[in-house]
Amino acid sequence: MQKEEAIKIYKSFASMKDVALLIILVFIATYILISALNNNSEDGIFIYVAMWLTALPAGIAYIAHDILKSVNKLDEIVNEDLDDKKYLEIIYCIIDYGKNHKQKNLQRTFYLIMQERYAMALIINGKRKEAEEYINSGEIKHEPYRMFSRACIDLDRAYAQGDAEKYIKIYKAAPKSYKEVKLHACRALLMQGKYDEAIEGLMKYTPKNKREEILRRFTIGEAHLRKGSKDEAKIYLEYVINNGKTLREKFMAEELYKEL
């Protein structure tokens, strides 16, 4: 994906023509249905209300699907292509454009999601300080996204410092949305020294994409190394080194590999 395509995706959310058309069609269908009734006004009102109660969730689902589809397309850069640097570049491009142009309609919602993605892109590129400055600047207006990003930064710092006690304390206070991610839960087990539990959980977990597979294998390798099983650790770390492309886990795996 190029910057131009990313901007095009952002611009597409300025128009709500498709959503408006959907609502108009439902309205017309409702009107025709009511007119076809045998002049029973009570039934007509009931069906009218029922149709709109159906149409509104359908319209919302349509909008949510459209946004999610675009977000997933952008996330593929890091999740499938394993190119964290390009991911940061593309997300920043959208953030910069959105910040300097008036936001219309669904662009506001899409931009809020991109703000959280930008903070995450900085973190996975090893730019924790910049991510923290971005959050502290108050740019991320949506509180759940801000809290999620803050937890990621604090946990990343505690992990880098090797401070298990601090890591667990932060993890326990992290948003539910963070702790629900299996990879995060297993990382917490590893930091508590529960290596076998972490490995077992990760062995049973089916990754959703290539990046998750890299993260899964890296954590398994690290857990084996920490418990002293160097032969097992070697297998998983070698996979990460050979397939991690530009992901920082590749370079972290290379450092751990030196301990074998």
Go through each PLM region and give its residues.
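N-terminal alpha-helical membrane-insertion module
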Residues: 1-82
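Terminal, low-structured helical/coil segments at or just beyond the last alpha-helical repeat
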Residues: 230-260
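"A position-specific structural signal for the A-helix of alpha-solenoid helical repeats
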Residues: 72-76, 110-117, 149-156, 180-188, ...
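N-terminal topogenic membrane-targeting module
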Residues: 57-143
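Solenoid-like repeat scaffolds
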Residues: 59-65, 95-108, 136-145, 169-179, ...
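A membrane-cytosol interface segment of integral membrane proteins
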Residues: 132-162
